[in-house]
Amino acid sequence: MKANADYVIFFDEYTFERRKMMKRVYDFLKKAETYYLATVEGDQPRVRPFGTINEFEGKLYIQTGKVKPVSHQIAVNPKVEICAFTGGEWIRVACELVEDDRIEAKKSMLDAYPNLRGMYDENDGNTQVFYMKNATATISSFTSEPVVIEF
């Protein structure tokens, strides 16, 4: 029984550290306000500004509309990269995006960004949220060594 208790403590410490690292990425993207999401369409890179980042059920989420080209690009290739700059530092996040079609996930995003409610609704069939999976974030600057965060 003691081994199981030790395992639970280890798991909790791992989960705590993972969430702490993920929060650092969340905080950076929130502070930047705008980040750039890169996808691929065929052999052509596509980059556009985004502004939504939300933590829901221990995962980082972004939001778009199903009618947008970015949605179709992610469906073909869910590997994306995000880049943002603020306060003399920049972040690059390489990850896979996984769609979460649950109303609760969409509602959480729209509650965090009420200004989007004029264009989106969790029940509209267009609102789309994705969470980041297998993410590696690198925070860099010209004055310090890069910090690598995996979540």
What is the meaning of each model-derived region?
Residues 4-21:
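Short, Lys/Arg-enriched N-terminal segments with co-localized hydrophobic residues
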Residues 27-41, 80-82:
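A short, Trp-centered hydrophobic/proline-enriched beta-strand micro-motif
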Residues 92-151:
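Charged, gly/pro-rich active-site loop segments
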Residues 53-88:
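A short mixed-secondary-structure module that forms the rim of ligand-binding clefts
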